[in-house]
C-alpha cells in the first residue's frame, strides 16, 4: 500500500515528516522514523512497512479526518495587511514549520514562487494542510493586490470559511472591500483579525468602526487589546473574561499565559471586559432566537453566570448565518494573538457538512469535485487542486469532466505543503488535495466519477427542475458555479528571441493560461504577433518574468496598451452576399441584419431574430449566424477593440443548398462589420476606482497631479494622521503612477486601483487617441 511518498530530499520535507510523526500511533511513528532515515540517505521510498490493522485505520484518519473536524479556510485582505505573515505564524504554532518565515526576509512557506519572495507579495494562492488541536485545517493564502483578484475569487469558491485580516491602523481598505464582496457572493462565513496592533497609529476602535461603516457588517467583539501601538502586550478574552499575556522575553511567541481577570488585580480592565461581554451577549441574543430564549430564561438576572461554552455555540451559529462577524486582534509580526485566532477558526467557522450545497442531493454520495486551480510542475506535469464535495477519490482511477465532456485518469493524490507535496492513498468529502495526471482539466471544471454518474445526477436534477423551474435549466445546474473571470484591461505584444523559439513560447503561454484564466493570449490578425492581455501592469510583468524563469525564454514585450472597447450610437441595416466556389461545390448565402445600441452594459452581443425568419431557421443555421456575430464583435472598426452594448437582429437569411455553416458565419461576420463601419461610433475607456493614502503635507501635490490625469475626486477622508483620497481616473492616465506617486511623496504614499466600468471618451480625447494609434501625431 503506497501510503506516503516523498518526492524530493530537503529540509522542508523532513519538517513535514515531523508533522505526521506528531499525529501518529507508536507503530506508525516507528515506520515514519524509518522513512525519515531513508529520506536523509537520499532514497525515494514508496511505502511504509509495518502498517497493519488498526494502524492503517489510524493513518486513514490522519489523511482523511472526520468531516466535522475539517476546516477549509482562506486568508484574505488588502495588500500589506499581513496575510502571509499571519499564515506563517499559524503554520509555526501548529507545528508544521520549525522556524518563523518572514516576508521581508523572503523565506515564507506560502510565497513559494521566486517573484513572490522577491516582491514580498502573494501572487498565487498556496494551499497548506495542517492540524490544530484535533482539527484538520486546509488553509489558502490569497493575494491582496488588485491584479490578482481572480486568485481570490478562485479560492473563495471552494472555501467553507475565511479569515479577513486588517491593518489595525488603516481599518477597511480598498482591496478589502473587493474581497469582502467576493466572499458575500459565495456566502462564505468569516471572522476578522485586526492585525498590527503593535503599529504606531493602531486603533482597535477605529478599525471596528470601519468594519461597521464600510462593510456594513455587525462586529462581535470577542477580544479587547491590552494596550495599543508600542504598548500592546496581549488581549482580553471577552467570552471567558480572561487575559492573555505574551512573555516579552519569548522570541517566538509560544510562551504566553492565560489568567482570569480579578477585581483585586485588574479592576478597570475587569469592568471594561464585563461591559463588553454583556454587550456581546445582548448582541448575539438579538441575532439568535435559541440563544435569546436561553438568556431570557435561565440567565436573565445575571449574565456573569452564562457559561462561555453556551455563548461560543451561539456565536458559531450567528457566524454561519452571516448575520455578524467575530472580531479578534493581535500582531502576527510580534507573535501575539495568533494561537487564539487558530482556536477561533476551529470554534466559529463551519465544517464542510455545515455548508448547504444544494447540488449534493443529485449525486447520492457519488464523487462530486471542483477543480479550482492548476499548476504546472516540470517533472509531474499539470497539478490540479481539487475540492471534494461528496464521494471519494483514489489514485489510478478514472474521472469524468462534465465541462469538457471527457474522461481522464488520476495517477496520484498529493497533500499540499506549499511547493512540498506528500502522496496520499485516498481523498474523502470535505478535503482539498492535488491531483496528478489530469491533462485536460482546467480551472472551474466539475469532476464526477463517471459519465453514467453525471447522467444519473442530471436525471435527478431534471426531476427537481420540473418542480422548481423550466426543464431546460437542469443541465446548467449540474455544473458547480465556476470562477468568474474578469476581462483584461491591459495588453501588449510579446515576441520570442527568434522565430525558432515561437513554438516554445506558445507552449509556455498555453501552460500559463491554464494556470491563470485571467491571462488572455490572442494573435493579431494584421501583424501576426502574439498579444498578451492581462489585469494590470504587475500581472503582465509577472507573466513575462515567469516565462524567463520557468521556461528559459528571453521574450520581448511591446509597449503596454489599454484595452479599449467600442460602441455604436445609432441603428444601421446592412446586406451582404457571399458567393464562392470551392472545388466543384458552390457556396452562396445572402444575409440582411440590423445592429443597434442597447442600454445594458454587456460585452456579449444581444442576438435577436425577426418574426419572419425565426420559425424557418434550423439549429445549425442559428449557430452559424451567432458565430458570425460574435466573430465580428471581437474587432471594432475604430481600434480593432471589442464592440459592446450592441444588439443584432437577423431579418433575412437565404442559403443555397450545400452551403457550409462556415461560409454562413463568414458572410454574417462581413455583413455585420459593414454595418458597424457605417454606424456612428464611440470609444469606451476603462475607468478605475482610485484610493490614495497620503500624509497631509503631500496632499496638495497629489491632488494637483490627479487633476492633470483627468481624475475625479469624490471624497477625502481622514485616517489617523493621513488623508485618503477617493475618486476615479481613466486607466490610460494612471499607467506608471506608482513611480510618480513615490516621487511626489518621497515614498510615503500608497494607492489601490480597481476597475469600475467602461465610460465613453469625450470627442477631443477620442480624436487624440485615434491620431496616436494611426500614426498621425
Curated annotation (Swiss-Prot):
It is found in: Mitochondrion. Its EC number is 3.6.5.-. One of its GO terms (biological process) is ribosome disassembly. SUPFAM superfamilies: EF-G C-terminal domain-like (SSF54980), P-loop containing nucleoside triphosphate hydrolases (SSF52540), Ribosomal protein S5 domain 2-like (SSF54211), Translation proteins (SSF50447). It catalyses: GTP + H2O = GDP + phosphate + H(+). Coiled coil: none annotated. Belongs to the TRAFAC class translation factor GTPase superfamily. Classic translation factor GTPase family. EF-G/EF-2 subfamily. This is Ribosome-releasing factor 2, mitochondrial. It comes from Bos taurus. The lineage of its organism: Eukaryota, Metazoa, Chordata, Craniata, Vertebrata. The gene is GFM2.
Amino acid at each position: 500500500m503506497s501510503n506516503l511518498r516523498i518526492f524530493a530530499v530537503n529540509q522542508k520535507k523532513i519538517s513535514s515528516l515531523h508533522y505526521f510523526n506528531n499525529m501518529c500511533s507508536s507503530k506508525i511513528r516507528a515506520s515514519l522514523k524509518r522513512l525519515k532515515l531513508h529520506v536523509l540517505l537520499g532514497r525515494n521510498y514508496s511505502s511504509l512497512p509495518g502498517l497493519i490493522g488498526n494502524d492503517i485505520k489510524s493513518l486513514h484518519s490522519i489523511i482523511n479526518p472526520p468531516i466535522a473536524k475539517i476546516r477549509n479556510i482562506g486568508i484574505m485582505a488588502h495588500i500589506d495587511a499581513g496575510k502571509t505573515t499571519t499564515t506563517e505564524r499559524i503554520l509555526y504554532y501548529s507545528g508544521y514549520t520549525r522556524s518563523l518565515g518572514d516576508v521581508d526576509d523572503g523565506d515564507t512557506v506560502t510565497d513559494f514562487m521566486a517573484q513572490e519572495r522577491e516582491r514580498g507579495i502573494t501572487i498565487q494562492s498556496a494551499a497548506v494542510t495542517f492540524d490544530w488541536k484535533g482539527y484538520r485545517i486546509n488553509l489558502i493564502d490569497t493575494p491582496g493586490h488588485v491584479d490578482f483578484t481572480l486568485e481570490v475569487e478562485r479560492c473563495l469558491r471552494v472555501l467553507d470559511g475565511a479569515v479577513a485580516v486588517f491593518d489595525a491602523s488603516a481599518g477597511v481598505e480598498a482591496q478589502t472591500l473587493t474581497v469582502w464582496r467576493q466572499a458575500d457572493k459565495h456566502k462564505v462565513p468569516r471572522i476578522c483579525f485586526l492585525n498590527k496592533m503593535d503599529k504606531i497609529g493602531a486603533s482597535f476602535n477605529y478599525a471596528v468602526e470601519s468594519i461597521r461603516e464600510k462593510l456594513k457588517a455587525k462586529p462581535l467583539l470577542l477580544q479587547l487589546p491590552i494596550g495599543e501601538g508600542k504598548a500592546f502586550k496581549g488581549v482580553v478574552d471577552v467570552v471567558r473574561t480572561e487575559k492573555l499575556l505574551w512573555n516579552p522575553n519569548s522570541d517566538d511567541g509560544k510562551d504566553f499565559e492565560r489568567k482570569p481577570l480579578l477585581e483585586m488585580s485588574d479592576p478597570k480592565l475587569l469592568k471594561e471586559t464585563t461591559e463588553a461581554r454583556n454587550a456581546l451577549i445582548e448582541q448575539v441574543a438579538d441575532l439568535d432566537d435559541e440563544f435569546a430564549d436561553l438568556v431570557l430564561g435561565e440567565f436573565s438576572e445575571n449574565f456573569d453566570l452564562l457559561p462561555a461554552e453556551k455563548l461560543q455555540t451561539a456565536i458559531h451559529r450567528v457566524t454561519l448565518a452571516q448575520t455578524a462577524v467575530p472580531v479578534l486582534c493581535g500582531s502576527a509580526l510580534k507573535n501575539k494573538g495568533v494561537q487564539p485566532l487558530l482556536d477561533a477558526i476551529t470554534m466559529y467557522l463551519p465544517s464542510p457538512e455545515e455548508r448547504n450545497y444544494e447540488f449534493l442531493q443529485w449525486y447520492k454520495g457519488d464523487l462530486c469535485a471542483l477543480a479550482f486551480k492548476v499548476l504546472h510542475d516540470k517533472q509531474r506535469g499539470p497539478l490540479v487542486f481539487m475540492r471534494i464535495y461528496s464521494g471519494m477519490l483514489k489514485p489510478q482511477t478514472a474521472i469524468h469532466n462534465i465541462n469538457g465532456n471527457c474522461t481522464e485518469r488520476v495517477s496520484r493524490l498529493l497533500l499540499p505543503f506549499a511547493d512540498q507535496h506528500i502522496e496520499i492513498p485516498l481523498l474523502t468529502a470535505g478535503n482539498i488535495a492535488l491531483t496528478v495526471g489530469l491533462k485536460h482539466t482546467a480551472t472551474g471544471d466539475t469532476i464526477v466519477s463517471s459519465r453514467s454518474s453525471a447522467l444519473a445526477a442530471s436525471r435527478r436534477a431534471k426531476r427537481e427542475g420540473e418542480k422548481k423551474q423550466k426543464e431546460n435549466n437542469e443541465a446548467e445546474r449540474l455544473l458547480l458555479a465556476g470562477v468568474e473571470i474578469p476581462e483584461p484591461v491591459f495588453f501588449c505584444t510579446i515576441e520570442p528571441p527568434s522565430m525558432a523559439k515561437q513554438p516554445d513560447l506558445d507552449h509556455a503561454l498555453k501552460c500559463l493560461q491554464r494556470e491563470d484564466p485571467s491571462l488572455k493570449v490572442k494573435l493579431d490578425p494584421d501583424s501576426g504577433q502574439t498579444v498578451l492581455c492581462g489585469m494590470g501592469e504587475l500581472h503582465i510583468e509577472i507573466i513575462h518574468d515567469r516565462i524567463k524563469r520557468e521556461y528559459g525564454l528571453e521574450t520581448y514585450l511591446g509597449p503596454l496598451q489599454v484595452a479599449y472597447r467600442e460602441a455604436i450610437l445609432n441603428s444601421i441595416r446592412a446586406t451582404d452576399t457571399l458567393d464562392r466556389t470551392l472545388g466543384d461545390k458552390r457556396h452562396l448565402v445572402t444575409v440582411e441584419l440590423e445592429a443597434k445600441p442597447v442600454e445594458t452594459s454587456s460585452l456579449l452581443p444581444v442576438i435577436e431574430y425577426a418574426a419572419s425568419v425565426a420559425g424557418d431557421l434550423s439549429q445549425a443555421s442559428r449557430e452559424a449566424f451567432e458565430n458570425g456575430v460574435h466573430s465580428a464583435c471581437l474587432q471594432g472598426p475604430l481600434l480593432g477593440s471589442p464592440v459592446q452594448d450592441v444588439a443584432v437582429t437577423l431579418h433575412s437569411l437565404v442559403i443555397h443548398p450545400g452551403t457550409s455553416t462556415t461560409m454562413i458565419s463568414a458572410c454574417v461576420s462581413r455583413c455585420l462589420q459593414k454595418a458597424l463601419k457605417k454606424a456612428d461610433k464611440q470609444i469606451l475607456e476603462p475607468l478605475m476606482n482610485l484610493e490614495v493614502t497620503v500624509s497631509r503635507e503631500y496632499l496638495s501635490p497629489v491632488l494637483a497631479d490627479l487633476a492633470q490625469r483627468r481624475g475625479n475626486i469624490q471624497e477625502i477622508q481622514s485616517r489617523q494622521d493621513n488623508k485618503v483620497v477617493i475618486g476615479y481616473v481613466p486607466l490610460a492616465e494612471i499607467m506608471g503612477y506608482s513611480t510618480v506617486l513615490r516621487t511626489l511623496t518621497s515614498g510615503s504614499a500608497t494607492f489601490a486601483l480597481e476597475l469600475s466600468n467602461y465610460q465613453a471618451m469625450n470627442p477631443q480625447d477620442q480624436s487624440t487617441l485615434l491620431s496616436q494609434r494611426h500614426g498621425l501625431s
